[in-house]
Curated annotation (Swiss-Prot):
Segments for region (Disordered): 148-170
Disulphide bridges, residue numbers: none
Keyword flag Transmembrane: no
Cofactor note: Binds 1 zinc ion.
Name the record gives this protein: Transcriptional repressor NrdR
Lineage start: Bacteria, Bacillati, Actinomycetota, Actinomycetes, Micrococcales
Family named by the database record: Belongs to the NrdR family.
Length: 170
C-alpha cells in the first residue's frame, strides 16, 4: 500500500478492525519512511447477475424494497426489514462468490422471511415462485404447518432441520 503522503511503496499495518456489519475491514497503517499514519477501508464487491445477464452491485435497499411489499399491513418494522437484508447479505457473502444469480438472492430471502412473518413469506413466495393455483398455496401452507409441527417435536421424523422445498407446477 503506497503512503498517501510520501508515496513510499510500503506500509505497516498497525491495527485492523472489522466493521459492525462485517462487510469491510478498517486498517490503520504507518509508513516506515515518513512515519505518518493513515487509514484504509477494504471491502469486497458482490454483484448480482440478473436474468438478462446484466450484473449489478448487491443492494440491501433492493432486498428491503422487495420484501416491504410482501409485509404491507403486517406487524413488521423497518428494523426487522433491515436485519433481514443484513442476514441475506451475510448468507450470500458466506458462499465466497463474487457474483451470485438474482435467483439465489431470492432463495436467501425466503428463510429469514419465513421466520419473520409467515403471511409475508407466503406473499413473497407466491410471486417469487410463481404460484398459479390454490393448490400451490395449499402446498406451501401444508409445508409451513409440517415445519411448525416438527419444531415442536424435533424427533417427529428426524428432519426438523431439513429445509422445506416447495414445488410448483406452471
Amino acid at each position: 500500500m503506497h503512503c498517501p503522503f510520501c508515496r513510499h511503496p510500503d506500509s505497516r499495518v498497525v491495527d485492523s478492525r472489522t466493521s459492525e456489519d462485517g462487510s469491510s475491514i478498517r486498517r490503520r497503517r504507518q509508513c516506515p519512511e515518513c512515519g505518518r499514519r493513515f487509514t484504509t477501508v477494504e471491502t469486497t464487491s458482490l454483484s448480482v447477475v440478473k436474468r438478462s445477464g446484466v450484473a449489478q452491485p448487491f443492494s440491501r435497499e433492493k432486498v428491503v424494497a422487495g420484501v416491504r411489499k410482501a409485509c404491507q399491513g403486517r406487524p413488521v418494522s423497518e428494523d426487522d426489514l433491515a436485519l433481514l437484508a443484513r442476514r441475506v447479505e451475510e448468507t450470500i457473502r458466506a458462499t465466497g462468490a463474487a457474483e451470485v444469480d438474482a435467483h439465489e438472492v431470492g432463495l436467501s430471502i425466503l428463510g429469514p422471511l419465513r421466520e419473520l412473518d409467515e403471511v409475508a413469506y407466503l406473499r413473497f413466495a407466491s410471486v417469487y415462485r410463481g404460484f398459479s393455483s390454490l393448490e400451490d398455496f395449499e402446498a406451501a401452507i401444508t409445508a409451513l404447518r409440517a415445519e411448525r409441527e416438527n419444531e415442536g417435536d424435533p424427533d417427529a421424523d428426524g428432519s426438523a432441520d431439513a429445509p422445506v422445498r416447495l414445488t410448483t407446477s406452471v
